[in-house]
Amino acid sequence: MILPKGREDLEGFSIKSFLIDKKVLILQIVLTLFLYNKFGFCVNFIIWTILLYILILLSIIDYKFKAVPDYLLLLLLLISPFVSDSLIDFIKNGFIFAGGFVILNFFVTFYIQNIKSKILKDDTLKEQTALGEGDIPLIAFIGGILGIKLGLFAIMIASLIALIHGIYNASKKIQDTPFIPYLSIGFIIVFLIQETIYNTFSNWILS
């Protein structure tokens, strides 16, 4: 299941240790080159580079610690409006998107804690939630930047990848599945291919 974020798990956390990791550096270089090819050297390039670096950090931290620092989520939300076409649309779509998932989280969490826990006779499920505290701000970011419909594409991709990985984890008897890495992957994929999505589903997206 998707985990709540535990602050105590972040003890000893250091951003520097992640930045010097070779795989992280390679991923950062690849995304930076893509952004440079897309925007050239401009303000948008700089802001998007920062945003994607934050997403990478959040993903790695969540995957390792099952928790994320609040200041990175706050930084993401404060910077992202600068690359949005409209601040008002960013705020509106972000609130609508996040609000919808907060309600969904309530129902799914109720099912996990009150129904599934009794069916499986597993008391540990009574403490689990469908989404962690750190997932909602990232969902708001996705909705604000991509809009409602493209945001749904990103969530669908994230959920599909999470489902596949969750099945693998279940086969290995690993229950904990952090969701932020999948949300980040879904967002980046849609961001990279959004023109293709527009061309394929333009009638639905623009309606």
Question: Where are each of the predicted segments found?
Answer:
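A membrane-topology feature that recognizes alpha-helical transmembrane segments
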Residues: 1-207
